[in-house]
């Protein structure tokens, strides 16, 4: 979390220094859209957000699903003049705190709490890079089945169980893996018939 190791009594002062703004988004709303210029980073307080890449014809690919405690837009907030190459959506609604993190980077006399925040920010960015590297492994698989097996295997490892719940519905999972939804649904049925998995909605069991 961005505020790990920071005392509750210090968080309010840090938020004030970073000009924190709280926003609540309804279901199926956009937080930011492709091409916008942003000056703040978003910190997810409740529910989750999706980072989306959209092509000229409006086809979407979910790059990431970020839940509570995750940060987004920090790179654009630091660069300032670079337009967004992604969109950020709240399909299930979301509560977000926006932070002017460039104030943190520009400060020459940071408090201990702000130094801790900067440390946590770097850790979150490193975790994001690790996640994107893992996603590249899914996307480089040649077939839909290979992509599904790679993704479900990684989820089982992360959840430390062969019974797992994924954060996507069918369309979202297809968008995340960059495959056709109908083809993916058919492949899931074949994988179940082949005795590899059992599933119901977004609950899976690896056999």
What would you call each of these model-derived segments?
Residues 85-86, 106-112, 131-140, 158-161:
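Short helix-to-loop capping/linker segments positioned immediately adjacent to catalytic or ligand/cofactor-binding
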Residues 49-61:
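A short beta-strand-loop-beta hairpin characteristic of the jelly-roll/cupin
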Residues 30-36:
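Short phosphate-coordinating micro-motif centered on Lys-Gly-acidic
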Residues 62-122:
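Cyclic-nucleotide recognition modules
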Residues 1-27, 76-79:
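Cyclic nucleotide-binding regulatory module and flanking cytosolic helices
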């Amino acid at each position: 979390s961005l505020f790990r190791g920071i005392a509750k009594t210090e968080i309010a002062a840090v938020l004030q220094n970073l000009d924190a703004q709280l926003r609540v988004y309804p279901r199926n709303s956009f937080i930011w859209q492709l091409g916008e210029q942003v000056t703040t980073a978003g910190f997810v307080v409740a529910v989750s957000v999706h980072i989306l890449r959209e092509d000229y014809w409006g086809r979407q690919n979910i790059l990431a699903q970020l839940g509570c405690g995750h940060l987004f837009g920090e790179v654009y907030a630091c660069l300032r003049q670079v337009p967004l190459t992604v969109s950020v959506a709240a399909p299930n609604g979301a509560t977000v705190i926006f932070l002017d993190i460039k104030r943190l980077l520009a400060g020459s006399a940071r408090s201990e709490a702000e130094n801790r925040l900067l440390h946590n920010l770097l850790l979150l960015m490193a975790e994001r890079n690790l996640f994107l590297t893992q996603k590249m492994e899914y996307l480089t698989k040649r077939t839909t089945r290979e992509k599904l097996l790679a993704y479900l295997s990684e989820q089982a490892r992360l959840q430390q169980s062969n019974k797992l719940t994924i954060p996507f519905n069918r369309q979202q999972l297809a968008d995340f893996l960059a495959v056709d939804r109908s083809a993916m649904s058919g492949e899931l049925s074949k994988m179940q018939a082949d005795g590899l998995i059992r599933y119901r909605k977004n609950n899976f069991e690896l056999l």
